[in-house]
Amino acid sequence: MESAMTPYVVGFSLDGLVICYLFGVPCMLQEVASAAPFRLGPGTCETDRSTSQTQGSVSWHEIASFLPGRTNKDCRKRWYGTTATKVNKGPWTEEEDERLGKAVQHHGTKWAVVASVVGTRLPDQCSKRWMHALNPEIDHSPWTPEEVVFACSFSPKDFVFLMHAC
């Protein structure tokens, strides 16, 4: 009987490093005592590219708990940024826009689900594309002079109040 593979393991090495293995491949390193921010540049984890076809459920909150200064979103973005070979980073195509529109219509703003339906973009990319370009509820036309005068009549304190009133 084949056992299910644990998608991630976090361990501590003898030399004071936190090592995160995703699907059996070391992909994140962090010195435990380091006060410097945790940064992973290009080429830091070349081996994690080989796991791009692996499926599984990962608790990004749990992984981040072992990496001081990193959030669950940092870890998720690092993973997808280095392993998701099918992720487009250039301009959106008409087909992607159509898939995004249908996915939002069906799933709402559950961006992880929407991104899985779109298939070629990350959740953050889908959210930004929808909110900044495609959402039909947002008026993307140039501001009228009346709108500019109205918007400029508020102080920053008014905006804070309005944001909390919604």
Curated annotation (Swiss-Prot):
Provide the HTH myb-type domain boundaries: 84-138
Its GO CC terms are: membrane; nucleus; snRNA-activating protein complex
Q: Which GO terms describe its molecular function?
A: RNA polymerase II cis-regulatory region sequence-specific DNA binding; RNA polymerase III type 3 promoter sequence-specific DNA binding
According to its UniProt record, where is this protein mainly located? Answer: membrane
- What keywords sit in the KW lines? DNA-binding, Membrane, Nucleus, Transcription, Transcription regulation, Transmembrane, Transmembrane helix
Membrane topology per record: Single-pass membrane protein
The entry summarizes the disruption phenotype as follows: Results in the significant down-regulation of cluster A, whereas it exerts no influence on cluster B.
Q: What is this protein called?
A: Transcriptional regulator ATEG_03638
Organism annotation: Aspergillus terreus (strain NIH 2624 / FGSC A1156)
List the top taxonomic levels of the source. Answer: Eukaryota, Fungi, Dikarya, Ascomycota, Pezizomycotina
